[in-house]
């Protein structure tokens, strides 16, 4: 498999948009969290990402509002602004038997540590991982486009992740991001790139 190093903005604009094909579950209570984590503990690999309410005021910041964790079939959107980072989620993040893939995981975990202490295990940082195959771009959108010739829409990135109800666009965006992390890790794990 031959992989390009980079992709330009004009090329990216022309690509078809990827849409999350599975089920999306919004988790807003501790009991829902326990059920979701029970399912996720049975999966061999998970895509992990987080969203924080954007701040447009200098010096103001917010805690992580949404933790999205996806398997191949479904994505769970944990509303941390409503539940906090509960013990079942901490146990999942610390579980060494489940591979967790992400992009800029260091930043995600740094922000999540503000909600609760934990020692994440079995994590793959995709920015480092894809570099060994010659991919120089670091954004999720560009890495995905290089590998799959589809683009991930980023129109919801700066939306209010602490809203009382997430819009369909926000749910689709969050789930697509998390699943795409698994997809990025797959071809590079299976196929030697030359």
Task: Enumerate the language-model features and the residues they cover.
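N-terminal accessory regions of nucleic-acid-interacting proteins
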Residues: 1-46, 115, 126, 179
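Acidic, Mg2+-coordinating catalytic module of metal-dependent nucleases/exonucleases
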Residues: 145-185
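Single conserved hydrophobic/aromatic residue that forms the stacking wall/gate
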Residues: 182-183, 187-194
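Short alpha-helix plus adjacent loop in nuclease-associated cores
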Residues: 126-146
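Short active-site oxyanion
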Residues: 23, 95-100
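Short acidic, Gly/Ser-rich segments with clustered Asp/Glu that frequently serve as metal-coordination loops
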Residues: 45-58
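Acidic beta-strand-to-loop metal/phosphate-binding motif
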Residues: 47, 99-105
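A short alpha/beta connector and helix-capping loop motif
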Residues: 56-73
């Amino acid at each position: 498999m031959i992989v390009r190093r980079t992709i330009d903005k004009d090329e990216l604009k022309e690509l078809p948009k990827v849409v999350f094909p599975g089920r999306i579950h919004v988790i807003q209570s501790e009991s829902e969290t326990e059920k979701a984590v029970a399912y996720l503990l049975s999966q061999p690999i998970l895509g992990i990402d987080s969203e924080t309410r954007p701040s447009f005021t200098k010096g103001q910041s917010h805690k992580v509002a949404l933790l999205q964790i996806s398997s191949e079939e479904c994505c769970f959107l944990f509303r941390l602004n409503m539940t906090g980072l509960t013990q079942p989620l901490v146990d999942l993040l610390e579980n060494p038997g489940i591979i967790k893939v992400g992009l800029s995981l260091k930043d995600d975990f740094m922000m999540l540590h503000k909600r609760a202490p934990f020692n994440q295990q079995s994590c793959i940082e995709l920015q480092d991982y894809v570099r060994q195959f010659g991919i120089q771009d670091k954004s999720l959108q560009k890495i995905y486009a290089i590998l799959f010739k589809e683009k991930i829409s980023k129109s919801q990135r700066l939306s209010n992740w602490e809203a009382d109800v997430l819009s369909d666009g926000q749910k689709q965006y969050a789930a697509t991001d998390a699943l795409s992390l698994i997809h990025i890790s797959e071809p590079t794990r299976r196929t030697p790139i030359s």
